[in-house]
Amino acid sequence: MASNDDAPVGAANGNGNTGAQPSLNVLAQYVKDLSFESPGAPNSLRGRDKAPGIAINVNVNANPLSDKQFDVNLTLNAKASFDQEVLFNVELVYGGVFAISGFPQEHMLPILFIECPRLLFPFARQIIAEATRNGGFPPLMLDPIDFAQMFQQKIAEDQAASKVKVS
């Protein structure tokens, strides 16, 4: 019975080529900024007969730290209001440091703007839920985010903007 347990790292990858396999590693995750405001408290904490309106904004930024390390920031803003009263406003910038290697260059933007925030989101979602709960409100459980759709929309907007001629 043969075993491959002793095969060296970076050995043949099955197609006859040797070299490093593509890898995406999370080196660190951190809260860069967290803000919770409840300007109307304690009056804003009273029960309501209907749910408040909640506006949510999401943004992703990525910056290189070195040739193979990147800092990706997921920004989540949630503002709850009832009539004209702001119940709470929570903002989180949640970051991750990623080591990315072995991928073709054309895959880097999708990795940075889709895969990396997808890995960060569950942790950021939990922080938002805990912040709203600790603020005296029911936990705000954000729905899953389609980062691929966000990325495609951003590419389309950038292409449309580049077609506009500056005079």
UniProtKB/Swiss-Prot annotation:
Keywords: Chaperone, Cytoplasm, Protein transport, Translocation, Transport. InterPro entries: SecB, SecB-like_sf. GO terms for biological process: protein folding; protein tetramerization; protein transport. This is Protein-export protein SecB. Residues 1-20 are annotated as: Disordered. PANTHER family: PROTEIN-EXPORT PROTEIN SECB, PTHR36918. It comes from Mesorhizobium japonicum (strain LMG 29417 / CECT 9101 / MAFF 303099). GO terms for cellular component: cytoplasm.
